[in-house]
Amino acid sequence: MGSSFFGRPKMGGSSSSSPTSSSSSPAKRGKNKNGSDKPKQPQRGLGVAQLEKIRLHGEYNCNSFNTYPSYHPSTYQEDVRIQGGYPSIPSSSPSFSYASSSPPPAPYGFHPNMMMNANNDQYERTTIRYGDSQPHRAPSWNPSYGILESQHFVEPNTTRHFLHEDQRNISLGSGIQNFETSEANELDLELRL
């Protein structure tokens, strides 16, 4: 059907202006359809493959934290929401949070710098970082930049030992061993992805 446009230069206009307008407008229309519409579609959001990666990574993070039997699952879900700075994160991906570089609009959560100071308990966790505890990096989607960013926080199981002074001498070694084992498992799973 596109070739019929080029075959009829005198379509309802004068002979001097019709060939120019009819030959330039189909070319212009073709560029608009193929050139500007197609690149805009991927820029609107994440692709299916990227969303699947994020979902799988979220399930992986959720499963790796739930291997600790001493941390009750219901309190873990509440604690992750506090750390993420987003009060109603769905349970399918609790380790992800939305962050924005502008003042926080309602659907996106808090500014990344403010997320660590969400409440007093969270502030204590971030300031008590001993040399033996390793920070955990959880990726989060930043809608203003269109990329994945990382935020640092210490694993809840590791900091629990440091917050209770009476248990510090008893469980310091076992807590670090548990963390190192989970770190080795995490590296193995990342290599498979």
Curated annotation (Swiss-Prot):
Xref: InterPro entries: SPEAR (IPR040356)
Keyword Nucleus annotated: yes
Region annotated Disordered, chain positions: 1-50, 85-104
Intracellular or extracellular location(s): Nucleus
Motif SPL positions after renumbering to this chain: 44-52
Biological processes annotated in GO: leaf development; negative regulation of DNA-templated transcription
Tissue-level expression: Expressed in shoot apical meristem, cotyledons and leaves. Detected at the leaf margins and in the vascular bundles at the base of the leaves.
Effect of L191S: Loss of repression activities
Main location as per UniProt: nucleus
One cellular component (GO) term of this entry: nucleus
GO function terms (MF aspect): DNA-binding transcription factor activity
Motif (EAR): 187-193
Disruption phenotype: No visible phenotype, due to the redundancy with SPEAR2/TIE4 and SPEAR4/TIE3.
Its biological purpose: Transcriptional regulator of leaf development. Acts as an adapter-like transcriptional repressor recruiting TPL/TPR corepressors to inhibit the CIN-like TCP transcription factors.
Entry remark concerning the domains of this protein: Contains 1 EAR motif required for the interaction with TPL and TPRs.
Subunit and partners: Interacts with TPL and the TPR corepressors TPR1, TPR2, TPR3, TPR4, and with the TCP transcription factors TCP2, TCP3, TCP4, TCP5, TCP10, TCP13, TCP17 and TCP24. Interacts with SPL and SPEAR2.
Name of this chain's protein: Protein SPEAR3
